[in-house]
Amino acid sequence: MTVRNIASICNMGTNASALEKDIGPEQFPINEHYFGLVNFGNTCYCNSVLQALYFCRPFRENVLAYKAQQKKKENLLTCLADLFHSIATQKKKVGVIPPKKFISRLRKENDLFDNYMQQDAHEFLNYLLNTIADILQEEKKQEKQNGKLKNGNMNEPAENNKPELTWVHEIFQGTLTNETRCLNCETVSSKDEDFLDLSVDVEQNTSITHCLRDFSNTETLCSEQKYYCETCCSKQEAQKRMRVKKLPMILALHLKRFKYMEQLHRYTKLSYRVVFPLELRLFNTSSDAVNLDRMYDLVAVVVHCGSGPNRGHYITIVKSHGFWLLFDDDIVEKIDAQAIEEFYGLTSDISKNSESGYILFYQSRE
């Protein structure tokens, strides 16, 4: 498979029938649909993330279950549920759908996306997951208040004001532990921090396992960076490290490929070759980690094509029922598993145009 320079002029109907032929009538999964999404002017950042999330099965199932509930006031989640439902209930197995309602709502809700410029797929993913979680938490809060009002218990003290966990958290949320050890008294203090995705630095000719190991490297705090130890009641040299305490059901890994270059006064792309395996086991876990021995399978990759954050293009590769598909806006193609290697990045020239993995989605086997 090569870079698809002529993808935009492909006939949609021909593309759809070719995909059915490539998969084969006998192999085509029952109740599965492969639909491209129309680009409404540089909305590939959005289309690529939506396709990746659609093929994260737990996420898709919860969005469709939300659609099945009683009619709610329109918000970003209802628009997403309508889009997913539209794909899942199509009579045809393959085709193209315009996510017009979702894009309109997105632009209405956030000024950052209310234009026709290229946006960052990771920023969009972050915004979408947090917005959905906020909507679900607000709905739960309203349900509780309505229940109290109905039962005449409005004066009951609130159990706690901490927002309830939603299915977004159940799927994507993990926990990091920031451990700091004072080198004078050996006291270890730790602070937990939740995440919906992990952002990791990239280096040339490495792997995701290496990037994650670097993420947890021990850092020495000395000189002006000394740590205030509450046991010693003074600033002391210390060692600091980050550990994974709780692993999520779906691990979303963001590769930090855009770096600000002082001499250029702008961000440039690090097209480094970073190998991401089809199977991943995490080793950088804390001593009190929950489910520390967990195996993950790669289910989707959002790929950035181009040389910079504000130009270029996003596509997505997904695994569905044992085979791999490439989604490039309205184009959908079946690809060989070996073709995934083309999206690792380049072995030379950091700013050269490339198609490289940007957001990886790994799903736990348990």
Curated annotation (Swiss-Prot):
Regulation acting on activity, per entry: Activated by interaction with WDR48.
Annotated tissue distribution: Broadly expressed.
Transmembrane feature ranges: none
Entry-linked PROSITE patterns: USP_1, USP_2, USP_3
Compartment list: Cytoplasm
Keywords recorded for this protein, A-Z: Behavior, Cytoplasm, Hydrolase, Metal-binding, Protease, Thiol protease, Ubl conjugation pathway, Zinc
Gene Ontology biological-process entries: adult feeding behavior; behavioral fear response; behavioral response to ethanol; protein deubiquitination; proteolysis; regulation of postsynaptic neurotransmitter receptor internalization; regulation of protein stability; regulation of synaptic transmission, GABAergic
Sequence similarity: Belongs to the peptidase C19 family. USP12/USP46 subfamily.
Protein name (Swiss-Prot/TrEMBL): Ubiquitin carboxyl-terminal hydrolase 46
Binding site for Zn(2+): C182, C185, C229, C232
SUPFAM superfamilies documented for this protein: Cysteine proteinases
